[in-house]
Amino acid sequence: GRIRRPLGAALSIGTTKITKSEGSNRSDTSGFETVDTIHRLKNKIQIWLPDLKYSDDLAAIKYSNAPNYFNTATTAIKTMYKQVGPYQIDENGLLKSGVIIRHLLLPNMLENTLRVIDWIADNFEPGQVLFSLMHQYIPCGRAAEYPEINRVVTAEEYQKVEQYLFNSG
């Protein structure tokens, strides 16, 4: 079997405060940025908050019209990490710098989420990045066109992912 590394403060991100203080700028991103865009922001952003929505490129195309999403997003995230390094928390418990990878759990897409978690565990050591698992998906807009995602995430789906996170380290 594969050895899994813990993801650090995987589910405790809600207790981490993110600051926008003097010298600490953050960037909420879709995760679908080009490396060139990230390079242009070097030394301007201390806290990156990229989304990593899909590990499945077919789902990325189907739901977001984003071909080559996973490769583009993971390359962007690695580039962000190279710029700011491991996350740093100051003496007041505030996040000063780092990368928080956000992932929204979607209904009927458990494998997508597990592969996102695996990618993070395979590419970062404990203490390097933070992970924010979000489960507040609310179907709206064109979601009605896709019955498989036209509902909220169940407690059972969330618990399975939560258990996977805790067992992965």
Task: Give each language-model segment a name.
Residues 151, 156, 162-166:
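Flexible loop/N-cap segments at domain edges
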Residues 1-146:
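Conserved AdoMet/S-adenosylmethionine-binding subsite of the radical SAM
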Residues 71-74, 159, 163:
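A broad detector of short, well-ordered amphipathic alpha-helices
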